[in-house]
Amino acid sequence: MRWSLCLVATFFLGSVHAGDWGTVVLQPEVEKLEEVEVPLLHREVPEHELSGGGLTMEPEAGPYQWLSDDGRIRLRVGVGEDKFEEAVLTIWNWDNIPIYQKRIRGGTEGQFPVEIEGFGSYLVTLDGMSEGEVQRRMIRNITVTPDMNAARETWKLDEFFLGICTFPGRYHWTPGGEATLPKGLTEEEARNLEADLMARLGFQVVRTDESLEMGRRESDENEFLFNFDRMDAAVEAYTSRGFEIGLQLMNAADWAVAEKHNHVEEHRWRYPHEEKAQRAYIKALLERYGESARFVQIFNEPDQVEFWSGTPDEFVTQFEFSKEQIREDFPEVPIANGGYAFVDDEKTAFFIERLHPHVDYSAYHAHGTLEGMIENFEKMKAQHNAVGVSPAKWVNTETGFDAWRLDQERRQAQAVAQKVLYCWAHDHAGIMLFCGRMTRGPGRDGRDLGLVDYQFCSRFAYGAVAGLVSVLQGASFESVLVEEEGVFAYEFVVGEERVVSAFSLSDEGALSFESDASQVMVCDPMGNVVRQVAGGDVDLSLDGYPQYLVFRNAGSVALSE
């Protein structure tokens, strides 16, 4: 565990010409700028997506190198005078607080060196201005995180796994077949960049493009020919980096739809498929990827018609023969249902009752806030109780937060870390965050749940996951200290240390702890040590980000009365 002590820095507004740019030092604890001459992050500003055309901001180390190992980042920044009179470069910390700002005159281009002390993700906006008004905003992140690849070796997978959903094939292409941003990047290049960034966070399990190519019928005798080229590439990108697979089994190709539904012309993949073809497809997938599977998940969100348009009974039939096929070759691998979406409570209850005998993990999905996830989890428990069953383990196989507006990236980071901690504390086998990189609605103009953006910038959520993993690698969950009135605190054990993570849904509140520890280290959401306390008693002011208290040589930790 690397600890970084924090200092306080203050930055001032200035106007610069080419060659006048000194190094800017960013530290975890800073003072807010008194005046900000650009719109705040909740204001909608037309986005300038790509460098050029009047605004340029690129890392000198090379395209997409927004994350630094040593904290040093040099940006090439330029403002075209034919497009803008000037631009304002602003740096915002992960609390959406502006901490640095410079004016840059039109016709200026130069190197902008930054040193980041400690860990963290910072937002950089470059606002092109004319006649005193912002016309376009370029948005990027610069980030330093610890390399947590080694966490896959120390993480206690049998207690709780931390996973990520990534779709380098699906999200590299638009529905019309054109590559999404960034321009000129091949699917292979994009896939490897994303895989490197996800591996660096220490994730152990991935759900990726296993069902990207559905195969085709080879002859009238129902022989099947499957093309795994793109799936092999997607899976190998992660297994070669030490990941296990959350192997999701979707339907085979459209030609294999059951005869009863042959009249359907659109979205045939949503309907029941011929048993022979579906079994052949499942067998082929398992032969190829089964040895790497952490668990196998049969289908996705069957309780909503946009994924399953057959009857509930037809789904149960297909689920049962799918399980039989899995068990022929992999009798021990855990099986999960496709995560429930709670779109139709009656369907969800039906599936829980009928599928319970066939699953090892009872799976559900929950995007949005922690409160929304808790609501879905309570529904899961209530519906299981209503039919008198209890799963061996819960699992959340898809959960994210839509950063629908630029200021919401802070909420995204908070919610992602909160949900990991909550699931860990509530008897889940694991959690699958959604998602690595999502390029629908490139940039911040549309719906986006990615930990990294379309330019491979690591968002605040990326830094928050890195902070969580850096502090809790090798941990075992110990106890819930408090879950009431929007305040949460969880206790973990890591070797000789006890670690408490605490947060508040209201962005306010405080907790006091007492222990027999020799020392307490207070860590911020990004994993920086911001305070050290002699002895075992400590007070903590709360906000929406989980913070971490590391109690050295502690036998016990409790809330103070």
Which role does the model predict for each range below?
Residues 4-15:
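Bacterial N-terminal signal peptides
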Residues 18-197, 201, 208, 561:
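Mature N-terminal, pre-catalytic/accessory segment of carbohydrate-active enzymes
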Residues 64, 89-90, 482-518, 524-526, ...:
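Carbohydrate-binding surface patches
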Residues 176-198, 278-287, 344-354, 411-420:
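Short, acidic/polar
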Residues 201-357:
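Substrate-binding cleft and catalytic face of glycoside hydrolase catalytic domains
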Residues 357, 361, 366-440, 457, ...:
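Catalytic-core region of carbohydrate-active enzymes that cleave or remodel glycosidic bonds
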Residues 425, 439-440, 447-497:
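Glycan-recognition and catalytic regions of carbohydrate-active enzymes
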Residues 533-561:
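C-terminal beta-strand-rich structural cap/linker in extracellular carbohydrate-active enzymes
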